[in-house]
Amino acid sequence: MRSCFVRISDEPTDVPVVCWKQLAMSKSYVVTRVFGLLAPMVLLFGGCKENVMGEQRGIVTMKGKPVTLTGTPVNVGQKAPDFEVVANDLSAVKLSSFAGKTCIIASVPSLDTSVCDIETRRFNEEAGKLGGDIVVLTISMDLPFAQKRWCGAAGIKNVQTLSDHRDVSFGSAYGVLIKELRLLARAVFVVDKAGVVRYVQIVPEIATEPDYNAVLKAVKEL
């Protein structure tokens, strides 16, 4: 896509705001002066639109209905993007906090749904069989309080549940944020001890469980 720029001040900085050709042809914009600087406020109708985060449609469905994933998709072999989420005790947790360990990262829409409940219990069971250098993280948009309550009721000991509700840091960095619902898609990522993505599984239908055997196979092959 061709880059579009509008100069908004006398400083030598071009800010990608809107397609200039469309702006010149449109009367639907207002330019205001704020503290001596020109700040364009542009109302656009189609055509050249801002694309802050990449969007993917048709990758996954929710009960058969296609949804839009936003963020930056990750690929096997790339350095795993760092992110910051919130633990049950409200402390900040980053992926880099687990440097030197293999991480299984499972994103789910909500622990309060039956499929997410089943999935997290299954990973909790499997995590108990893995070595101490492997950690399992389950990330959702649930509030930390709700996650803590659920873990207590379900007896979850081997999986760390983390909340992405504050900044959507994980969902944006891994391309699994559902635009229409502000929930995370069902996906599983395996990151090795060197911080490299070794496995990616985006579950096509959110209402179904992931392929556990494929995830465990990827971990055991590291």
Language model regions located:
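Bacterial N-terminal signal peptides
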Residues: 35-44
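Chalcogenol-based redox active-site neighborhoods
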Residues: 48-222
